[in-house]
Amino acid sequence: VEEQAKLVDEAFEFGALEVGAAVGVTNNYLERARSLQRSGCRIICVDIAHGHHKLMERALSNIRSALGDGVHIMAGNIATGYAAHDLVAWGADSLRVGIGGGSICKTRIETGHGVPTLHSIFECYGTDIGATLIADGGIKNSGDIVKALAAGADFVMIGSLLAGTDESPGDVFITDDGRKRKLYRGMASKEAQKDWRGSYSSIEGITSSVEYKGSVENVLLELDQGIRSGLSYSGARTLAELRENAAFIIQTSAGAVESSTHI
C-alpha cells in the first residue's frame, strides 16, 4: 500500500496533472483506495480480469461509500451490455470494455471466453447508460483507435503501441543480428506473476519482446495524425460527428488483406 502511494507521489513530483491508480477487489483493496485518495489520486481503477462479478459489486459499493463522489471510479474489464448496466448501477463512472483482446493476452485461448473488442464497444454503447467507455485490447494502430471511437468508445487503452519506448518499463537489449528490442510481458504471464506475488496461477498472458521505438512522443504524434486523418474521412470534426457519420460494414478476409500494404 505504501509503495503504491509513493508511486503516486512521484508522479505528481514529475509534473503529472492527474494520476489514476488501480486496486483489486479482495484483501486490502479498501485500505489501498483510501491511501491513494490521501496521496491526491482522484481516479481509482477497480481492475480485475472478469469485472461482472459479485466481488466487483461489493468493492464498488464500499469504495464509493468510503471515498464519496469526489473520486472517479473506473471499473472492468467487461464485455457485455448487461455487465455495463450492472457496473454503473454498482457505482462505476467509467468502464473498461474488452476481454482477451490484448496482444500478449491469451485469456480467450486458455478459458474459451471473450468477445471481440469492437463488438463489446457496440453492445455497451447501445445500452445508453451514460458511462464513459474505454476500449481496452486489440488496438494495433491509429485505424483501430478510430474504429473504437466511432463504435462508441470515449477513450482507448493501449499497451503494445507504447511498449518499446524509452518511457516504458524494461531495459533495451541488442539481438544477435544487431537490432534493439525491449522486453514486453503481460501481467497475467508466468514471469510477471512470479515477480509481483511470488507465485503464479491461471497463466493468461505471455512474455515477448518488441522493437525499440525511441521516445513515446514520436509514437503519440503518429497516432494523433492518424486519428485526425481518420475523422476527416468521415467528414467529422468531433467524436460525436464521427459516431454519427461513420458506417460499418462486414469485411471478408480478402478485404482485410487488401486493406494492408501488400506489395
Where are the predicted features?
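Active-site-adjacent beta->alpha loops and helix N-cap segments on the catalytic face
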Residues: 1-12, 26-32, 48-73, 78-89, ...
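Alpha/beta catalytic cores of nucleotide-metabolism and tRNA/nucleoside-modifying enzymes
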Residues: 22, 68, 89-93, 112-135, ...
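Active-site beta->alpha loop and helix N-cap motifs at the rims of alpha/beta catalytic domains
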Residues: 16-45, 49-50
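Short amphipathic alpha-helical segments, especially helix-boundary/capping motifs
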Residues: 8-10, 35-39, 59, 97-101, ...
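Hydrophobic faces of well-ordered beta-strands that scaffold small-molecule active sites
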Residues: 17-23, 44-46, 73-76, 95-97, ...
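General structural signal for secondary-structure boundaries
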Residues: 1-3, 42, 215, 222
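Catalytic cores of alpha/beta
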Residues: 28-39, 73, 78-97, 140-154
